[in-house]
From Swiss-Prot:
GO terms for cellular component: cytosol. This is Lactate utilization protein A 2. GO terms for biological process: lactate metabolic process. One of its GO terms (molecular function) is oxidoreductase activity. Belongs to the LutA/YkgE family. Is involved in L-lactate degradation and allows cells to grow with lactate as the sole carbon source. It comes from the Bacteria. The lineage of its organism: Bacteria, Bacillati, Bacillota, Bacilli, Bacillales. It holds the Pfam family CCG. It comes from Bacillus anthracis. InterPro entries: Cys_rich_dom, LutA.
Length: 242
């Protein structure tokens, strides 16, 4: 089985350790991994801001970059959702590119979805002793319907005590450009999320979308909260070394 890594902008620029963790996870699963260098932003910020033509250019570049990939795996439910839902929407009136968009979507998977449902991994052997909560991101849980897969993998990490996060389905307030355009509302939303996290007395927040982790983690640091923030890939990879 050959897998291509769709690294995403946030991992490339702000969370390189997440990309490294995905490589470790794929190696542990015995998967042959490559990295198409032609990949770029999925186009979601442009699309959500109304710049349709710019988003199409990004989408076409992504389609070309992964044209020959057997499977495409990304550590982001948000970017996977963009490929699955909005590429097809953008190219509805263009039969050639619509077909290519469908072909790309059919091969693109969020990381935990791929590990659980394609690789069938039900015996993840790792160890990390922490009290944690898991944040369900909007795009991953609502748009892709992926809710149980990350929790299933985390439940297999020895020593990891996952507490139930109150109102876990509530948005953290990031929403890409929403956090910039509606900053005061976004700030209120992330403060509410942090209150719910603190109520569990967890010392670790785990998530599967780096936008959410950047938003919540940034607020935690500004408020001097002693709560660590990790991507699910980092947790699974950390455990492999214990």
């Amino acid at each position: 089985m050959k897998v291509s890594l769709f690294i995403t902008c946030l991992s490339d620029v702000f969370f390189p350790q997440v990309g490294k963790s995905v490589v470790e996870i794929m190696n542990q699963c015995g998967v042959e991994l490559d990295f198409p260098e032609g990949q770029t932003c999925c186009g979601q910020p442009a699309y959500n801001s109304g710049y349709q033509e710019d988003a199409k250019l990004a989408a076409k570049q992504m389609i070309k970059a992964f044209e020959h990939s057997e499977y495409i795996v990304t550590p982001s439910g948000s970017c996977a959702s963009m490929v699955h839902h909005y590429y097809k929407e953008m190219f509805k009136g263009d039969s050639e590119w619509y077909e290519k968009a469908v072909h790309l979507a059919d091969r693109t998977y969020e990381l935990t979805d791929f590990v659980v449902n394609i690789l069938g991994k039900n015996d993840w052997k790792s160890k990390l002793v922490e009290k944690a909560v898991f944040h369900q991101s909007c795009h991953m849980s609502r748009a892709l319907g992926i809710k149980e897969e990350p929790l299933k993998l985390l439940s297999q990490v020895e020593g990891l005590d996952i507490k139930e996060l109150p109102y876990c389905q509530d948005c953290c307030g990031f929403g890409g450009t929403f956090a910039v355009k509606m900053s005061s509302i976004s700030e209120t939303m992330v403060d509410e999320k942090i209150k719910h996290i603190e109520a569990t007395e967890a010392n670790l927040l785990i998530g599967a979308d780096m936008g959410c982790l950047m938003n919540i983690g940034g607020r935690l640091r500004r408020e001097n909260k002693n709560i660590q923030v990790l991507h699910v890939a980092e947790v699974l990879a950390k455990g492999l070394n214990k």
